[in-house]
Amino acid sequence: MGAIDLQKRWGAVLAACAVLLMGVRSADAAEAIPKHIYEWVQSTARQGYYFNKEYIQYAADAHGCIDLTKILVPTLRVYDNIQIQDVVSKRRWRMLPLEGYGDLSGAAEYLLIDLRAGTVRVTAHEDLDSAWGTISREENAKEFTLASLSDKDVEKKFFNAIISYAAAHQEELIRRSKGILSDADRKILAEQQAKAAKEQKKTAKHP
């Protein structure tokens, strides 16, 4: 499944959430975010970081095979007033349109995490209003190289949390992904599951 298709599907989820969050300002937005959809990771002085655990999945290659090294995930950031002012100030300095930015509350970013390359590409960035409607959209906004980020970097902590979640919920991601497992990956997963079951059995015998 491509990143664009995922963005379209998640757009429908944001629209549904907008009905629930209508009129909610950023100060209260975190309390209103549906916890069964969004996984909270961290909050800084400027924003809260979430990812959509109902839509996180693996990408598929050109042959329709699931690529276990590439994760597609929609993310959500909730801004505080200082971050809102910072975003607006930067847009004003760059002479970009400001229509709708009086109601800025956060941003949606669609990530493609390439585990083999060690990169995270933001395939799209959307600034959101208080009803989670899109104010503006930027394609292929930026790319991060994980190795170049400090372990204390909040972005790296966010990305690592998503990667860890994906590893712990691999079966869920596979079922959700739009593709089929290659025979090689199916064999590797079967071996991993057999090894895990063996270790679990050994632990049960000798706690």
Q: How should these model regions be labeled?
A:
Residues 27-109, 113-207:
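N-terminal secretory-pathway/extracellular module detecting exported/lumenal segments
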Residues 2-14:
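Bacterial N-terminal signal peptides that target proteins for export
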Residues 13-22:
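Bacterial N-terminal signal peptides
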Residues 4-5, 21, 172, 191:
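General helical secondary-structure elements
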